[in-house]
């Protein structure tokens, strides 16, 4: 029995492709793994705050020294980190905005990437503290296409960043399913969506 953390980051509702696809995966997964539990967070409709000065002061000082203001500033981060660490598997629905991730998802990442919690640093450099056995599935939606080996690959700041920041915390078992070319004509859109749905079915069977 596994605990899955499912996060959507699109502010769009029923029109969101990443939401529809992440929901399709979770629904199919629950059908075939009825004993698993799913914790859901909707960052698109319920965003977490960006880090601010009190947050930074709290993150880089001992809890024993925290004033009531600092305790309040870091409380949500502690909750999000506990939730993140408690999950055996992570499923993220992430649209591409301006070649990267939505600011809602970046704010979430900034809340959970914390020294002493999800990474540490010593004389040898940085080391992730998150259990590397956790699996991550990231389902994206993209208007364009950024195939490796083409000039357009340089525009993809979404997948490389997510692989880097997850790896920074210790997570290396990361799978991407891209629904792309969504703004490149109906034929390209339908072909890509069909491919993404096939990949989701494969992930349900093999992930």
Curated annotation (Swiss-Prot):
InterPro entries: Flavodoxin_fold, Flavoprotein-like_sf, FMN-dep_NADH:Q_OxRdtase_AzoR1, NADH:quinone_OxRdtase_FMN_depd. Binds 1 FMN per subunit. Belongs to the azoreductase type 1 family. Keywords: Flavoprotein, FMN, NAD, Oxidoreductase. It holds the Pfam family Flavodoxin_2. The gene is azoR. Quinone reductase that provides resistance to thiol-specific stress caused by electrophilic quinones. This is FMN-dependent NADH:quinone oxidoreductase. HAMAP family: Azoreductase_type1. It catalyses: 2 a quinone + NADH + H(+) = 2 a 1,4-benzosemiquinone + NAD(+); N,N-dimethyl-1,4-phenylenediamine + anthranilate + 2 NAD(+) = 2-(4-dimethylaminophenyl)diazenylbenzoate + 2 NADH + 2 H(+). FMN binds at residues 10, 16-18, 96-99, 141-144. Its cofactor is FMN. Its EC number is 1.6.5.-, 1.7.1.17. One of its GO terms (molecular function) is FMN binding. It comes from Nostoc sp. (strain PCC 7120 / SAG 25.82 / UTEX 2576). Homodimer.
């Amino acid at each position: 029995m596994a605990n899955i953390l499912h996060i959507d980051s699109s502010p769009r509702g029923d029109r969101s492709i990443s939401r529809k696809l992440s929901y399709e995966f979770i629904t199919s997964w629950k059908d075939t793994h009825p004993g698993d539990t799913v914790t859901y967070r909707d960052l698109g409709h319920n965003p977490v705050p960006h880090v601010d000065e009190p947050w930074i002061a709290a993150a880089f000082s001992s809890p024993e020294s925290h004033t009531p203001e600092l305790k309040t500033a870091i409380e949500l981060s502690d909750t999000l980190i506990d939730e993140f660490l408690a999950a055996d598997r992570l499923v993220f629905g992430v649209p591409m905005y301006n070649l990267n991730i939505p600011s809602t998802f970046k704010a979430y990442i900034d809340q959970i990437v914390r020294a002493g919690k999800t990474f540490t640093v010593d004389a040898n450099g940085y080391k992730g503290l998150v259990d590397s056995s956790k699996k991550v599935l990231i389902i994206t939606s993209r208007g364009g296409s950024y195939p490796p080996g083409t000039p357009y690959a340089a525009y993809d700041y979404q997948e490389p960043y997510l692989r880097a920041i997850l790896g920074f915390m210790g997570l290396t078992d990361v799978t991407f399913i891209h629904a792309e070319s969504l703004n490149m004509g109906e034929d390209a859109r339908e072909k890509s969506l069909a491919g993404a749905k096939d990949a989701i079915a494969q992930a349900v069977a093999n992930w």
